Amino acid sequence: MYLSVPHYPSLKFTAFQSHKRNFRVFAVATNEAANYLPEAPILIPDGPWKQIDGGVTAAKGFKAAGLYGGLRAKGEKPDLALVTCDVDAISAGAFTKNVVAAAPVLYCKKALDISETARAVLINAGQANAATGDAGYQDVIECVNNLSKILQIRPEEILVESTGVIGHRIKKDALLNSLPQLVRSLSSSVGGAASAAVAITTTDLVSKSVAIESQVGGSTIRIGGMAKGSGMIHPNMATMLGVVTTDAVVACDVWRKMVQISVDRSFNQITVDGDTSTNDTVIALSSGLSGFNSNIISSLKSREAGQLQECLDVVMQGLAKSIAWDGEGATCLIEITVSGASTEAEAAKVARSVAGSSLVKSAIYGRDPNWGRIAAAAGYAGVPFDQMKLKVSLGNILLMDGGEPQSFDRAAASNYLRRAGETHDTVRIFISIGDGQGEGRAWGCDLSYDYVKINAEYTT
């Protein structure tokens, strides 16, 4: 399968096969940018929005850049990214629940407590700067202070994300030396967003970026985002970083609540391997530049807030699904939809349980329609339901109903799984646990031999 890549001049194309996925990877012949990744497929549903180009620079007021600063242990793939806003942007963040939180996570939490706005997000790949003590935290402070002088903004308006090897401090000298060029490279173009999306990746085989345009309260708004993640992915965030930008006009308290709701419906609903990272961070910025005539969204219960929430959900879920699709060693995306629960939260909990089951994931990789594993994972989710109302379908093939196995074409079910694996498509599992109105989704991927190989060889 060949995925499309954006146009860049003077490109040298090569092809390689990795974990049963054929990708066309291209490298720019200059030293400024090399070893670009292909883009993940766009995984957003149809709706009252339009998918557009631009990622984090699609919304008005935002610029981005990515370059190689010498932070990675190998190669010259971009490893340093910067996203900036021309104005003070309303800021929000969501972070790992891991108590061994990385230095940049601790810093961002404090910065968001101090200021309701931010102007920049600095991201490095190569070193996680987690479990690095006070020295690692001081590295963050020094990098922020240096960047604030170059950008001429307050230090507390700069947020930081890091990804890479735990226990390794940032290569501070390399980062500091790269900051002037990084700032000079800032662009509101699609290319600026694309280079930043590549720079934040680690074991990812694709970059993840998406943007949409929609109507909110009579104004045209844009929301875009980028994310990274492939392994160490589990609910309560994952080893994933994300930046989301919008030009919607929204109050800080409402925006921060919206972001947490969307994170719970997206990044907290994906799982690859059951490991919760030390560095999970999603930063969301709102420039408010969609229109000076727009009324500010000041109530979470307003019609306009509902429209913006839906758009934010779509972007974050699109990025989250791209992460699961790109799971280390994975051959397919798995989408679990649970209905009939008493609440959305209970449905989401059951969906997460099934998506995270190693036995379910292994069965899907083996193209085995083993509905018993699905039923068992639903049952141990910690959500009470009447097992006599349990219903399980694989695609449009009914496997279990009324708590009992159903007669089905096993060959057809196995072929459904096989086709998804051969084309890196989506396996859809539908579960009903009762008569309630609660519905929730979770996403994961199958578990292959390659997952063990990748992580056995990864430097720790």
Swiss-Prot record:
Site-annotated residues for Cleavage: A238, T239
UniProt pathway annotation: Amino-acid biosynthesis; L-arginine biosynthesis; L-ornithine and N-acetyl-L-glutamate from L-glutamate and N(2)-acetyl-L-ornithine (cyclic): step 1/1; Amino-acid biosynthesis; L-arginine biosynthesis; N(2)-acetyl-L-ornithine from L-glutamate: step 1/4
Keywords: Acyltransferase, Amino-acid biosynthesis, Arginine biosynthesis, Autocatalytic cleavage, Chloroplast, Multifunctional enzyme, Plastid, Transferase, Transit peptide
GO cellular component: a single term: chloroplast
Activity under varying temperature: Optimum temperature is 70 degrees Celsius.
Bridged cysteine pairs (disulfide): none
Record-linked Pfam families: ArgJ
Keyword Repeat: no
Catalytic reaction(s) noted: N(2)-acetyl-L-ornithine + L-glutamate = N-acetyl-L-glutamate + L-ornithine; L-glutamate + acetyl-CoA = N-acetyl-L-glutamate + CoA + H(+)
Transit peptide: first to last position: 1-26
Superkingdom, taxonomy of origin: Eukaryota
One Gene Ontology term from the biological process aspect of the record: ornithine biosynthetic process
Enzyme nomenclature, EC number: 2.3.1.35, 2.3.1.1
Main location: plastid
CDD domains: OAT
HAMAP family in UniProt: ArgJ (MF_01106)
Family matches, as PANTHER family: ARGININE BIOSYNTHESIS BIFUNCTIONAL PROTEIN ARGJ, ARGININE BIOSYNTHESIS BIFUNCTIONAL PROTEIN ARGJ, MITOCHONDRIAL
Subunit structure: Heterodimer of an alpha and a beta chain.
Name of the protein in its database record: Arginine biosynthesis bifunctional protein ArgJ, chloroplastic
